[in-house]
């Protein structure tokens, strides 16, 4: 599973991120097919360059015909969002193009607050950061796609189960 290679790299590189898409739904225990990793990152220059460096090292390239380091330029990111309707900056593996990492640019969360409230899962000696169930639900409500509405229903069931289990 290519996910682990990415998650291990994020952990070792000390990237400030959390998983917020279908993979987070899976990691909360909801079976669901997903092909990519949707992450939200702190958009400060240092953090962005950590992740772009990691992705380049692992063989990932941007789907857009731009330098990956352009993601560290707030003016370019603003232009992509406002003038090109870009919602996520996608990277794919140059030899295995089904391996996709989407850095979500447009969402309804305050990164610092959400990072503080993240859920930490431990696997093979690394910490994996997930958006809290509440934050995943907020993001999915913001998107409003059919699959997102189904995910919200299932996440609410997981939340209820966890609340009952933990008292």
Residue ranges and their predicted role:
Residues 1-167:
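Compositionally biased terminal segments of proteins
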